[in-house]
Amino acid sequence: MSAEASTTPAAETPVNGTPETSTTPAAPAAEATAAETAAPSTSQPHSASLYVGELDPSVTEAMLYELFSSIGQVASIRVCRDAVTRRSLGYAYVNYNNTADGERALEDLNYTLIKGKPCRIMWSQRDPALRKTGQGNVFIKNLDAAIDNKALHDTFAAFGNILSCKVAQDEFGNSKGYGFVHYETAEAANNAIKHVNGMLLNDKKVFVGHHISKKDRQSKFEEMKANFTNVYIKNLDQEISEEEFRQMFEKFGEITSATLSRDQEGKSRGFGFVNYSTHDSAQAAVDEMNDKEVKGQKLYVGRAQKKHEREEELRKQYEAARLEKASKYQGVNLYVKNLTDDIDDEKLREMFAPYGTITSAKVMRDTNIERTQTPDSDKEKKEESKEEKPEAAEKTEEAAKESGDDQDKENKKSDKKVLGKSKGFGFVCFSSPDEASKAVTEMNQRMINGKPLYVALAQRKDVRRSQLEASIQARNTIRQQQAAAAAGMPQPYMQPAVFYGPGQQGFIPGGQRGGLPFAPQPGMMMGVPGGRPGQYPGPFPGQQGGRGMGPNQQIPPNFAQGIPMGAMGPGGIPNGMGYPQMGQVQFGRGAGGRGQVPGMPMGQGMRGPGYGQGRGGVPVQGQMRPGQGGRGQNAQPAAGRGEEAPAAGLTAQSLAAAPAPQQKQMLGEALYPKIQAQQPELAGKITGMLLEMDNTELLSLLEDDEALRAKVDEALSVYDEYMKNKGTEGEAAGEAPKPKEAATEESTEENKS
């Protein structure tokens, strides 16, 4: 039998890559449950498949093979792993070629240490019905912490053949104080219960009984809740005695036990328990004594609960309160960020007060850890220094002390309320959703102290996380589609993304190898192999004889995708790619010519078939003039491309009105001239880097030259660091870093050759 066909115990069967949730605390014991009628086939299975549990996550098939092959020939080994993360689930299957080897492995290797953890071996039971019957399954509690799986197995092995034995452990490997032993027959289980129940194991009296499934325990528990007899009382006066406590509750019925909880010194802890013989008496005590004042304190009297019950009730109460709070503040609580450090709670409230009634306004701050020195410590230091000085300086010291006291008073006043540093964001809660909506409309992107505010409805952390994950997934999908569209273009390696400004030649550092330091964005052109713009390898040989384009200036397929409108010259050709600016030029099919350039998409500059003479091409030199002869050229008036003009006076309204893919293009066209004035050589690169930012932040940079200059400097430092790291890698590889100009020339020569 192959390991793929073998199944796991019920508690550890993977469902969609995750272990099945156990139905009982005894689930680990029910792993190998088998009906009494199946005993012969269980002890002598037709297959030789073993289940190996309690494995360390780092255990591999090779480690298990080394251990189990010492017994006999192993047919196959499989460590079960999560379907998604591929992490080990902590158990495996070992298949032998014959049953005898499996029996020897079960006898000799059970509880053997593997990576410091004792493994647990049992026959693999493929029938889940037999695993979940529960016959022969014994539950043991009140175990000493020193008792492990092997010690428990050795203790109970005298009463019959054990199929599975396990001590429950927490996440740190410590015993939880209970365990399970699953016998082959019900008679063996009854025999173990008869002889071990109530015995001392490691000086602790243990309870041994038949395992009850969680479903049965739950139904029994609900019945016990409805017929409770044990009553819990708290808020008791500490002076009350045991006798007074008993007399207080005796009038409701016969009491089997009553006790007050006391500390180590014998003082009352203010609560106790009373157990009645009947449920009616307990219910009467709860109804009569709950919320009753005794010695000036209002009592709480209710059904005694176990710890897990109380925790579950508290969890439900917390969840209900959280949902109620979320629904209460839905649509009225605003999140405000980009606040300056001088804005406190009062100023934040004043900023939003004109838009409605504010119920709360809070600026989030860091926890103030550092405290100024207290006046007491100052006085102590002064007294110490006073003792060290000679008596002749006492008068001077007294004067200094008086002035120091005055300073201490001033410091005390200033230290009354020390606020931490502002985190730059806060929350404002209005009384109605309409007021909150009005505040968002009026205050979002408003300049406050030179910074544009970001105002939006507050969201819970899990909602923000889900939205962010959806956004990232959508972005990755778009990138995959773009990559698939450009799959026909050979790309031995890619340069960093570059933004081409209107009429400018984009700058790409030459001679680089490796991946993109920054992810491409809409409005940026992917870097090209080689060193200079316009150089493409592969099936685009240099054209000779003045036919259209000069050497190393070929147009690759899909090259126009991702180029911003402002960077597109006439005819859909990016400016600065080695082509001169000209009137509207169309690539068309000339009479007897070869037509459109292969793979060239019909861009904005190619609005229809033009018919010229000869092959479609673009002149290498000179400015195109109306009527100028050219092979395969038809001049068009430039008035038809007004939509391609660079955006001027870009506003949030005009940006929001544009389609999402064009927004980055518009921002890039507006940013490029400003950046070019500061960094002419790296303007295209820095623009591409800044386009990674949020649109609202880019709009604020357009309005604030100082902030833009700071961002440009920051981007320049990041770029310099990147180039420095690339140079360091080249030196480590035995190559000296080359200057930009030399690297560019070298890559040009490579492309020519």
UniProtKB/Swiss-Prot annotation:
Superkingdom field: Eukaryota
Bias (Basic and acidic residues) ranges: 376-417, 737-753
Keyword line: Cytoplasm, mRNA processing, mRNA transport, Nucleus, Repeat, RNA-binding, Translation regulation, Transport
Feature: compositional bias, Gly residues: 607-619
All residue ranges annotated as the PABC domain in the record: 647-724
GO cellular component assignments: cytoplasm; nucleus
Pfam families on file: MLLE (PF00658), RRM_1 (PF00076)
Residue intervals of the RRM domain: 48-126, 136-213, 229-306, 332-460
Low complexity compositional bias, start-end: 1-43, 633-649
Family annotation (InterPro entries): Nucleotide-bd_a/b_plait_sf, PABP-dom, PABP_1234, PABP_HYD_C, PABP_RRM1, RBD_domain_sf, RRM2_I_PABPs, RRM_dom
Similarity remark: Belongs to the polyadenylate-binding protein type-1 family.
Described function: Binds the poly(A) tail of mRNA. Appears to be an important mediator of the multiple roles of the poly(A) tail in mRNA biogenesis, stability and translation. In the nucleus, involved in both mRNA cleavage and polyadenylation. Is also required for efficient mRNA export to the cytoplasm. Acts in concert with a poly(A)-specific nuclease (PAN) to affect poly(A) tail shortening, which may occur concomitantly with either nucleocytoplasmic mRNA transport or translational initiation.
Name of this protein: Polyadenylate-binding protein, cytoplasmic and nuclear
Originating organism: Aspergillus terreus (strain NIH 2624 / FGSC A1156)
Classification lineage: Eukaryota, Fungi, Dikarya, Ascomycota, Pezizomycotina
